[in-house]
Amino acid sequence: MLKIYPTSLQRILLLTALLLGMKPSYAQNIEEVLAFRKKKPLKISGSISARTTLFSSQPSEARQSFTCQLTGSVNLSLYELLNIPLSFNLNNYGANFSYPSLPNRLSLHPSYKWMKAHIGDVSMSFGPYTLNGHQFTGLGVELSPGRWQVSAMAGRLLKRVDADPNIPSLQVGYERWGYGLKTRYEGSAFALGGTVFAARDRDGRISFDIDALGIYPKGNIALGIEGSLSLIKDLKLSLEYGLSRMQQDLRSTEVSYYHALRADVSYSFLGNTLGVGYERIDPGYATLGAYYFNNDYENLTLNYSRSLFDSKLSLALSGGLQRDDLMGQKLEHNKRFVGSVQVGFTPSEALSASVSLSSFQSYRNLKSSFDYINARTPYDNLDTLQFTQLSHSLDADISWRLKQSEAQTQTLSATLSYQEAADRQGRYIQPGQLSRFMNLGTSYSLDLSVLDLTLTGGFNVSNNYADRKAVLTLGPSLSLAKRFLKKQLSTGLSLSYNETQETGHRLAQVYNLRATAGYRFWGKHGLNASVAYQERKLRHAVSSPRSSFTSELSYSYSF
């Protein structure tokens, strides 16, 4: 960490602090000034790293053979009051392509007390129904004076992507700008907030035919209202509402309005927590402040959780109903029941286990479009086909520390995942519509502290049943890690083999070999290197076995 002492700046700040703090208490202000004087005027801390990767394969693959990346984060602190963090990510990924969102990013995040700014290539979230994590290039601020919270942003959401005749698959697009404001007040027993977000495409200087490609300039205004209320102790109600005004084509006057609503109630009593949630999102709900939206569904959920035996055993239950086709306009209408159970057990520091179960049933009514065309009365389609989709999953893991001493530590662990899905009509599973997936992994680790050596062995088995065929993949893995030079030099070597079988016949074999090395020197510098080789042998391959070689070199410096 770098330390700088600009005496003139220090004297000015000390004098200002003294003049501003004379009134309440002279002795108190003298102590504050003395404490302030002990602080370093300027501290610079952070890290920077550079990485290069070389890739080659036989036969050649459509993958970039050389990539490089420069990343870093730097923080400037003035008297431990004003913080100015700077982060950047520069690379040559896809150097020959144009992106609506740039892979290279440079951002600055200065903060002072309850004020914080975001400058450059950043992202912010106001709520799930307005601005939700969309990257933009511009300026954002977050203010939190007292019980108030104020956030604002303005910037370019998407960069214009022009048509390129040499790349017909390139997704062209408009330059898109967005602006947003969110305010929220947190009271002792309630909270209330509101959000407004607007975005609009700029359709000038485009290089493609709008009507031919069907890519139209869009405009959007999204409003959000949120609030929470605590009626009594441990009882909390929360509500969030979103309204999206979407214009799919700015050249037209047609505008669509969509609504979204979410409400939750939770109550804690005698170590129990009980909650009820409801959410409804209109078909077609979307905003230009998020990359993806789930819509056209209605959820009703019930949750329960409790800890037992001095928190050694935790239990969480949830269940709910979901339906879609809220407007009755789809050919398929789905109703779904979802339930899950999560259990965690930690009887001692050496043993821990967890189990998670989930199950849902989806009821689906299929209707031919001719059923609508030929319908004469509202009752004609009551006997349409009814299907039930079943899905069950199980996840379990256990970790057992067999032995722990100053000389060695032995650990045994295992994980199990199982998933089953099927389509049922009436009481019968449809032919070819049953699938099962199971994965089992075990590992044993031996850490010899005296030798700075760690050995790990494992075995994995996966079984995938679908389309009346069972595919089995299994194989062992072995890794070794050794530290030298008082743990400054770390080395590693790993080997793995797996093969895929179908009805007893071998389909593929995969060999992996990887070596790594990392060296820390002068306390703040790090140098890392790795090489990896993979070979694939396919049963029906015409050519020789496929192989690939990847090497990586990186350097890091922290200060």
Regions found by a protein language model. Name each.
Residues 2-13:
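Bacterial N-terminal signal peptides that target proteins for export
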Residues 23-27:
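Sec/Tat signal peptide C-region and signal peptidase I cleavage site
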Residues 88-157, 273-274, 279-284:
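Outer membrane beta-barrel
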Residues 154, 159, 163, 167-211, ...:
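Hydrophobic, small-residue-rich alpha-helical packing segments that form membrane-like cores
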Residues 65-71, 101-103, 198, 202, ...:
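Exposed, low-structure sequence patches enriched in small/polar residues
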Residues 71-76, 139-153, 176-197, 220-236:
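Transmembrane beta-barrel wall of Gram-negative outer-membrane proteins
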Residues 30-59, 64-66, 80-86, 110, ...:
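Transmembrane beta-strand segments of Gram-negative outer membrane beta-barrel proteins
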Residues 13-21:
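Bacterial N-terminal signal peptides
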